[in-house]
Amino acid sequence: MTNSNLRTENHFDYVKITLASPDRVMEWGQRTLPNGQVVGEVTKPETINYRTLKPEMDGLFCEKIFGPSKDWECHCGKYKRVRHRGIVCERCGVEVTESRVRRHRMGFIKLAAPVSHVWYLKGIPSYVAILLDMPLRDVEQIVYFNCYVVLDPGDHKDLKYKQLLTEDEWLEIEDEIYAEDSEIENEPVVGIGAEALKQLLEDLTLDEVAEQLREEIAGSKGQKRAKLIKRLRVIDNFIATNARPEWMVLDVIPVIPPDLRPMVQLDGGRFATSDLNDLYRRVINRNNRLARLQEILAPEIIVRNEKRMLQEAVDALIDNGRRGRTVVGANNRPLKSLSDIIEGKQGRFRQNLLGKRVDYSGRSVIVVGPKLKMHQCGLPKEMAIELFQPFVIHRLIRQNIVNNIKAAKKLIQRADDEVMQVLQEVIDGHPIMLNRAPTLHRLGIQAFEPKLVDGRAIQLHPLVCPAFNADFDGDQMAVHVPLAIEAQTEARMLMLASNNILSPATGEPIITPSQDMVLGAYYLTALQPDVQPVDFGDRSRTFSDLEDVIHAFEDKRLGLHDWVWVRFNGEVEDDDEREEPVSSETLSDGTRFEQWTYRRDRFDDDGALISRYILTTVGRVVMNHTIIDAVAAT
């Protein structure tokens, strides 16, 4: 015995969207109750009773079809409580179960006349027109009851299969057929509306048509060949998916679950409802009226007009505004159809399925973080404490700072120093991923080591901006925390910003300094024309090492473009092309001084270098010192 309420995991390889047959649509909505009654068909346009505020039976919110609106309670109230689980009430026919079944149980409307599916008729390209090899204008004339189409020419010599006839032309032919001297034995058959379209589609034998098209393609070229290939491709797709062309004409339309098109009561006693309910109501009203007209054998012109109105109602339900006048509600606002709910940026796919919010993620504005290393980013403490909360709670309990989760959460809310210390321990070595939409290539999401910062903005290293196509004029970025050890390892090994220096598209470096970085490097190393070099020996401008120069600059004893003499024993490259020094002096102890334009060297009597002072600017010392520190750090 299996419990139907248990969640079962179904593993599948892919989801395929294909045409649904009328039988499949009936299967979605039809259920057989234990007493043998078959439910699922929505026959009434009513939604809820205005006095009892309960759903109307066989209406758009029917509890018998879609399930109870209250957990474990039938419509009439005979059965209440969970102990009656699975029982179907004998009085009202409602199954006693959870109300959440109203989110997935469907119904259906059996149409009194077939209607064309507007996606396949008015889509680009029009699959109905391609399959029938007819102009779209002609197909529309048939569907919307403007022209007859010849389904069988019979013995009439002037008629051809699929030929269009106006009302007057058909009346003339009818007079001719039924004349006393008529020689036509096999009468021609014509049709109009979606019924005629369905007949034409049923007459198609896809395999034979595909074979015939392949033969025609072999002997044709140019525009005709392209048209034949287009038609063959559509037919091959129908064959591959085991779909029949006549399924593009609907005999049954599904009614989506009521909790996906809710009706809620507002404060003033009025109701707010989904637009779909209004669109379904129009379809049901027109369908019921058509069925009644057919029962009483109403004149053909009235029935035909009702069929056209039913076609327009179903068109509006599926895709409002695609053809004809847009159906509007209160305040002349167009009603949202099924297509509007699915498509676009705010549609179900892009808004709720592809772009859904996930746990362990955050979002904030980015600002420049020039003091960061390239593999680091500044993460606001407020965000970090929220993103890493489970890790912090675990560590607080493990270190016996608190005894339970509730106490840990209270401590975190107070943001004590020990919490911040634990947070720092947690984020050390735990990479986070930053993503900037739109993620157009793989470098649109990269991993960084977080550094806790004050404020509410994420700090980003300026060098990684080209990869994200980011700038600091209000751009926002999303933060994601990889949880599993495998995910953290992958993020560190493959996605760390410092490991993604080359563009995957071109192979050229994408980490290139630009804008203020280039300007800053230029300003730091530029020579000011109005600042004169100093002579060697000026004690205020002579320093024993690079650190002393930087200290003097930080103490504001020197400006960024001031000239200084600084001792430096490394290799020096300069633009001095002289072969001989400016001056040379040998002392009594054998040591020798050589004065060049930008350096002063001292050699012993064997010619070995004892010391070297170079003439440079404070900015160049800062630049050199920064590069040396960066290289040493790696």
From Swiss-Prot:
Per UniProt, Mg(2+) binds at D471, D473, D475
Q: What class of enzyme is it?
A: transferase
UniProt-listed SUPFAM superfamilies: beta and beta-prime subunits of DNA dependent RNA-polymerase
Q: Which residues bind Zn(2+)?
A: C74, C76, C89, C92
The enzyme's E.C. designation: 2.7.7.6
Q: Which reactions fall under this protein's catalytic activity?
A: RNA(n) + a ribonucleoside 5'-triphosphate = RNA(n+1) + diphosphate
**UniProt GO MF annotations:** DNA binding; DNA-directed RNA polymerase activity; magnesium ion binding; zinc ion binding
Q: Which domain of life is it from?
A: Bacteria
Q: Per the UniProt entry, what is one GO biological process?
A: DNA-templated transcription
Which UniProt keywords are given for this protein, alphabetically ordered? DNA-directed RNA polymerase, Magnesium, Metal-binding, Nucleotidyltransferase, Transcription, Transferase, Zinc
One GO cellular component term: DNA-directed RNA polymerase complex
InterPro entries in the record, alphabetically?
DNA-dir_RpoC1_gamma, DNA-dir_RpoC_beta_prime, RNA_pol_asu, RNA_pol_N, RNA_pol_Rpb1_1, RNA_pol_Rpb1_3, RNA_pol_Rpb1_3_sf, RNA_pol_Rpb1_clamp_domain
Cofactor dependency:
Mg(2+); Zn(2+)
Q: Could you give the cofactor binding note from the entry?
A: Binds 1 Mg(2+) ion per subunit.
Q: How does it assemble?
A: In cyanobacteria the RNAP catalytic core is composed of 2 alpha, 1 beta, 1 beta', 1 gamma and 1 omega subunit. When a sigma factor is associated with the core the holoenzyme is formed, which can initiate transcription.
Q: Which NCBIfam families match?
A: PRK02625.1, rpoC1_cyan
Stated role: DNA-dependent RNA polymerase catalyzes the transcription of DNA into RNA using the four ribonucleoside triphosphates as substrates.
Q: What family is this protein classified in?
A: Belongs to the RNA polymerase beta' chain family. RpoC1 subfamily.
Q: Mind telling me what this protein is named?
A: DNA-directed RNA polymerase subunit gamma
> What species is this protein from?
Synechococcus sp. (strain WH7803)
The gene behind this protein is rpoC1
